[in-house]
């Protein structure tokens, strides 16, 4: 069992890194949709791989729990409350949060909150509903993440961290990083390869999103990790330079920050665009897809291509029970191995203690492939290429199926030697799937 758990892993050493990994960090203004899932699954598996290789990792979710989007959430719930609870005629603004989940929150608020609240002036109502709805959404997000097998070490509140803004802005001023123009406060980010300088404080004295992010990154960098990894959506590409500029002004080494960008996901079903969720408006919810194909299939397909490339797949492929469905084909390989072990007269201990001698070319090739997992894991971590593990598992499963179909394994004089090779294949497939956050099956049936 110890061999099984540790095969391919490394113990912490002087070369081990201390990594701060921030990912998902979706605004708590709605349920998680499929666009969030890719970065979520990637970040979770990257953390598993890093820990497997002996590194220390902290996984954090940055909760954007202040600002205009949170107020807009409260306003949207208040308008839904007036329309669906008070039965008033309501005029909605051009921009607001829509979907059945907003109506659900409004109706729940009627039961959860004091009736007297709704007699207050509108700004107080919106403020209370903003916090109430945000808390509900964060609970739902955590539930969505749990259904994907993802758990964070910490959730950082933007509202709490931003209380330190004055000290951070004072340091930026001392570093000559700020100036005033057009009644706004600007960051001289163009000095550090940004396209232009950026506004931190607007004319109305409110802070921009960047200001909050600068305070957050200062809080992170004070913890002195070896490396900081952020996983953002590809639409945040232009944001990298301005954050790195702020780090330099604050006296940090911005090279310690690596930003990985997650490209878009396009889901199909029967070669048609996947149906949007009525509950969330114009989004495909993670929960809907998990209910459709399962957590493991979803994780595998999201990790099967580089994070920075577009991903398109038909969910019906993940329901097929043939070689066109990679995750089924890998499960099937492991199931075949375990079925042979059950039929074998030898114990696992006997098999593992059998010396491997006089192997032919095909047997050596399969054994070599099974033993290649450690270098695949290292390469996937160093290159942030987690798809390498998916490709490895698919290839190893295919090689095993070819080996299995080519001749007998149990009814031969070399049965123990061949079973040992098969055990090594199973071990590598199991650990590969473990790092992908997938539990490999030891038995499958047609119903699976």
Regions found by a protein language model. Name each.
Residues 4-448:
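Non-catalytic interaction-recognition regions
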């Amino acid at each position: 069992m110890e061999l099984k758990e540790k095969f391919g892993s490394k113990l912490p050493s002087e070369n081990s890194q201390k990594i701060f990994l921030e990912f998902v960090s979706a605004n708590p203004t709605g349920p998680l949709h499929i666009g969030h899932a890719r970065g979520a699954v990637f970040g979770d598996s990257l953390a598993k791989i890093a820990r497997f290789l002996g590194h220390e990792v902290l996984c954090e979710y940055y909760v954007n729990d202040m600002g205009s989007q949170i107020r807009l959430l409260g306003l949207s719930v208040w308008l839904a409350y007036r329309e669906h609870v008070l039965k008033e005629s309501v005029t909605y603004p051009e921009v607001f949060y829509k979907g059945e989940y907003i109506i659900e929150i409004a109706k729940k608020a009627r039961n959860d909150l004091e009736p007297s609240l709704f007699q207050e002036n509108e700004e107080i109502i919106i403020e209370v509903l903003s916090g109430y709805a945000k808390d509900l959404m964060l609970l739902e997000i955590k539930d969505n993440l749990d259904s994907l097998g993802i758990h964070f070490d910490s959730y950082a509140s933007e509202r709490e961290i931003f209380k330190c803004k004055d000290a951070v802005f004072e340091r930026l001023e001392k570093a000559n990083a700020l100036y005033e123009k057009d009644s706004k406060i600007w960051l001289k980010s163009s000095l550090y390869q940004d396209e232009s300088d950026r506004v931190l404080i607007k004319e109305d004295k409110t802070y921009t999103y960047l200001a909050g992010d600068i305070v957050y990154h200062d809080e992170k960098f004070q913890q002195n990790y070896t490396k900081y990894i952020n996983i953002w959506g590809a639409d945040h590409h232009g944001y990298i330079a301005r954050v790195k500029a702020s780090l330099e002004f604050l006296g940090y080494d911005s090279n310690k920050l690596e930003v990985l960008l997650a490209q878009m996901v396009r889901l199909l079903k029967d070669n048609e665009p996947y149906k949007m969720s009525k509950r969330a408006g114009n989004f495909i919810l993670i929960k809907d897809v998990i209910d459709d194909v399962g957590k493991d299939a979803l994780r595998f397909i999201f990790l099967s291509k580089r994070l920075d490339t577009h991903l398109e797949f038909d969910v019906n492929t993940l329901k097929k029970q043939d070689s066109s469905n990679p995750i089924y084909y890998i499960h099937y390989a492991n199931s075949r191995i375990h079925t042979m072990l059950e039929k074998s007269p030898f114990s696992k201990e006997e098999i593992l203690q059998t010396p491997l001698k006089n192997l032919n070319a095909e047997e050596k090739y399969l054994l070599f492939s099974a033993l290649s997992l450690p270098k695949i894991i290292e390469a996937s971590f160093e290159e942030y290429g987690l798809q390498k593990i998916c490709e490895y598992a698919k290839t190893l499963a295919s090689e095993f199926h070819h080996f299995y179909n080519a001749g007998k394994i149990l009814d031969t004089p070399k049965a123990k030697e061949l079973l040992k090779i098969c055990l090594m294949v199973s071990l590598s497939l199991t650990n590969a799937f473990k790092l992908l956050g997938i539990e490999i099956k030891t038995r499958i049936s047609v119903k699976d």
